[in-house]
Amino acid sequence: MIVSRQVIRSVVRKSFNRLCSANVVALPSGSTKEALKELRRKTGYSYVNCRKALNEFGPDNLDEAIKWLKKRAIEEGWEKAAKLGDRPTRQGIVSVMTKGNKAAIVELNCETDFVSRNEDFKRLVEDVTKAVLHAADRDGTSTHGFELLNSNINSLKTSENGMLVKDLITEAIGRLGENITLSRAQLILAPPNVQLFGYAHPKEGTDRVYMGRYVSVVGLKGSNKTDFPTEKLGFQLCQHVVGMRSLTLGTPLPVKKTSVKDEVSQDDEINAFYNGEVTHIDENETQLLRQSFMLNPSQTVHEYVTGHGASIVDFYRTELSSNVSEESFQS
């Protein structure tokens, strides 16, 4: 049987058209475009995955699409985490957040400085820090000084939607493409009459969560006998602890009665009449109460604080990757 070339061409053309039409993806409608834009804004996931979610659930069911995306992101994150788990995480951020007599300190590590400065990474740090502080609401208070507790990071949940922090981190691994480890999740509890203040340097983060390479927490009690705001006093002391590298709280320096005449040359008689109290400050001092106050070096920290009618109960200082063992969720 002889088939003409024209018939063959017609058959091939029809087959080719059917094949192409089967593989062509329809362009999104106006409502789908808006839904796609909204989905990307809410989740930050790729165009491809958001498109798949909309194809699965439609533009009118964004909540289900978001759930699907988060589940898929965690699954992809665990796969990527398994591949990246051996990579060292030497960069990152330390954060602090305070609420009354409680404070949360978190250290989240990543591979590069580039990712540590990423806004997505900082949002992750903020979510984890809030989760740690939220856990403090269930852990009571201290009866004396500071009580430092390590949170159970495997059961830690976010305060907003109850999502496990380890799943939140795994999701970020898939999104950012780097190994991420939570090496510190600490609670500081103080007595009910103590107010905690926090600070981070260099100062980053948000209005409520301070982030940086160094963090400090100072606990104050007592009412001001001046108009100087307690919040400002606490902030100044936190700055001092970071900058002056205080190691212990210590005790106040003894104030000695001394004759100025004994401390000057015999030719200098101008101060010979003075016989008062002088505090001798050691510039190498590491006890907080005995250190020269950073913003007013003529006074010790103890003198400055008591001058405002307050007292320091305790303090805490730490920095990125100091005295903690890195713990990864990847196995």
From Swiss-Prot:
Presence of keyword Nucleotidyltransferase: no
Subcellular location: Mitochondrion
Keyword Protein biosynthesis: yes
GO biological process assignments: mitochondrial translational elongation
Keywords tagged on the record: Elongation factor, Mitochondrion, Protein biosynthesis, Transit peptide
PROSITE patterns linked: EF_TS_2 (PS01127)
Residue span of the annotated presequence: 1-14
Annotated InterPro entries: EF-Ts_dimer_sf, Transl_elong_EFTs/EF1B, Transl_elong_EFTs/EF1B_dimer, Transl_elong_Ts_CS, UBA-like_sf
One GO cellular component term: mitochondrion
One family name in Pfam for this protein: EF_TS
GO molecular function: translation elongation factor activity
UniProt-listed Gene3D superfamilies: DNA helicase RuvA subunit, C-terminal domain, Elongation factor Ts, dimerisation domain
Family indicated by similarity: Belongs to the EF-Ts family.
Physiological role: Associates with the EF-Tu.GDP complex and induces the exchange of GDP to GTP. It remains bound to the aminoacyl-tRNA.EF-Tu.GTP complex up to the GTP hydrolysis stage on the ribosome.
Listed name of the protein: Elongation factor Ts, mitochondrial
Organism: Brugia malayi
